[in-house]
Amino acid sequence: MKKKGRKSRVNNSQRMLQALDEQDLSKADQYFHKALETDSSEVLYELASYLEGIGFYPQAKEIYQNIVIEFPEVNLNLASIASEDGNVEEAFAYLEEITPKSDWYVSALALKADLYQLEGLTDVAREKLLEALNYSDDTLLVFGLAELDSELGNY
């Protein structure tokens, strides 16, 4: 039962997603730009994550760049998008924004290791994983290091 006098507020991010669902890209683009102007940073963060997940990288990137001051961890997302676009230097630049004092530093080191490995710099990738292990004993880091050691012939 609906309460009288209360309107359900649909934000522009939701309208954009509805337009995408209806395959109306023109309308989705209009709502996207309205969302950038009117929706909260939290709502935009959710929208960007969703858009990144479905491959709308330019839109996700634009949102992340607008909210990076409030949510510095989106530098990880920006780095991933840059890497997907083949802009490895740009990806590294985003990762450099994440300092050792950040809760996201280990993730940044792991992503750097991935990027170095993709660039064929396996020794540097290994160094980044070893550095990450100084901050965390996450089993994925241990596995990644074992994988690199195997690739390097370090048994």
Annotate each language-model stretch with its function.
Residues 21, 53-54, 84-85, 118-119, ...:
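Register position in tetratricopeptide repeats
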